[in-house]
Amino acid sequence: MQGRVAGSCAPLGLLLVCLHLPGLFARSIGVVEEKVSQNLGTNLPQLGQPSSTGPSNSEHPQPALDPRSNDLARVPLKLSAPPSDGFPPAGGSAVQRWPPSWGLPAMDSWPPEDPWQMMAAAAEDRLGEALPEELSYLSSAVALAPGSGPLPGESSPDATGLSPEASLLHQDSESRRLPRSNSLGAGGKILSQRPPWSLIHRVLPDHPWGTLNPSVSWGGGGPGTGWGTRPMPHPEGIWGINNQPPGTSWGNINRYPGGSWGNINRYPGDSWGNNNRYPGGSWGNINRYPGGSWGNINRYPGGSWGNIHLYPGINNPFPPGVLRPPGSSWNIPAGFPNPPSPRLQWG
C-alpha cells in the first residue's frame, strides 16, 4: 500500500518541480541584469566629474583608455564655439569650455555615450573616408589631363590656409592613405598618374564596340578589326565561286572563263554534255574523231548504226543466228575458223 502511494506521489512532485523551475530562472536572470545595470551606471564617468573611487570601482576596475586607438580617434567630436565674452555658458562647470588653441580635450572630459553608437559612428567614419577618397581620384582623373596640374597626392595651396584642426585631420587621412599606396607599389603610382580612362575613350567614342582602331571599320577583315573575320583572296568574285580568275559564272569549274554551264571540256565553245577531246561533235558522240553518227562506237567514222566491225565494208563471216562469244570456241560449227580478234562482240 505504501509503495503505491509513493509511486503516485513521485510524478506529482516531479511535475511541481518542473513548474517552479522557469520562475526561479527568471528571478535569477532579473537579479543579474539589475546588478549589471547598476555597475554600468556607477562605472561610467559623468561630464566634468572625476571618476569616483569606491568598493564598486575596486571590485570592477575600469580599463585604461588608449589615446592611440583608431576607433576612439575616429569618433566625431561635438565641437562647440566658445562664447565671445569669455564667460562659461549656462550649466556651470559641468560643461568644459574649449581652450583658445582649439586643441583636443582630455579623455576624462568626453561625454558618456552608448558603445553601440560609438561603433556605428566609427563605421560611418570609415565609409565616409573610403568614398571621398575614390571620388576624389575619379574627379581628378576626369578633370585634370596628364601634365596639366598636380597629382591627387600633392598638396594644394588651399591646404596651407586651413585651421590647425583641419590640418591635423588632413595629416591623419594622408597617414592612412600611405600604406595603401605602398602596398600597390610602382603599379599604384602609374595608375595614380595615368588613370585607365584613355583605354575606355579608345573603345567607346565614334566607332563600334570592340574595335581598337577607329580608322578601320568593324568586320572588314584587316588588322585591328573585330574577331571572326576571314579575308577573301579575290573580293570581286561572286558568292560561291571557286575559280581563281574573277568574273566567271556561278558553278563554272573550267580552267578558262567563258564556258557554258556544266561544261567540263578543256576548251570553251563546246555544246552541253560533250565529252569529246575536240569540239564540233554531236551529242553523245564518244568517238575519238568527230563526224560519226549517233551511237557509233567504231574506231573510224562512216560506219552505220550498230556496226561493230573493225573496218567498214566487212561482212560477218558467220551465218546469221550463230552465237559466238568473244575469245571462245563453244557453240561454233565444225569447219569455221576462230574469230581473228577477241574484241569482237555479239552479232
Curated annotation (Swiss-Prot):
Residues 41-110, 148-189 are annotated as: Disordered. Keywords: Extracellular matrix, Secreted, Signal. It is found in: Secreted, Extracellular space, Extracellular matrix. Residues 148-157 have a biased composition (Low complexity). Residues 1-26 form the signal peptide. One of its GO terms (cellular component) is extracellular region. The keyword tRNA processing does not apply. One of its GO terms (biological process) is extracellular matrix organization. InterPro entries: C6orf15. Residues 41-60 have a biased composition (Polar residues). Pfam families: STG (PF15809). Binds to numerous extracellular matrix proteins. PANTHER family: SIMILAR TO RIKEN CDNA 2300002M23, STG PROTEIN. This is Uncharacterized protein C6orf15 homolog. The gene is STG.
